[in-house]
Amino acid sequence: MEERERIIHLWFKMWLTKQDLGIDDIFEEDVTYVESWGPKYHNRKMVKHWFHEWNTRGKVLVWNIKQFFHKGDQTVVEWYF
């Protein structure tokens, strides 16, 4: 669980700093990433493209984690902007 939380914190930090600090290390090549409001990205290349493109025009000012939920091999994060 600690490793999962470390990875999630790293992912949030990437958005806050607008830096790819290891997308290749935290996502498998065949990842499916679903945003909280619906859009899906079907592979690591698309996730990286979305990350880099979004960060050319936007900035995440605050992204706080309220709590983690762990069940088996799944982890869910409650967060707020």
Where are these regions (language model features)?
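A solvent-exposed, acidic/Ser-Thr-rich amphipathic alpha-helical stretch
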Residues: 2-3, 20-72
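Amphipathic alpha-helical repeat scaffolds
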Residues: 9-13
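Small-side-chain structural scaffolding
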Residues: 14, 31, 75-76
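A short hydrophobic beta-strand element
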Residues: 72-81
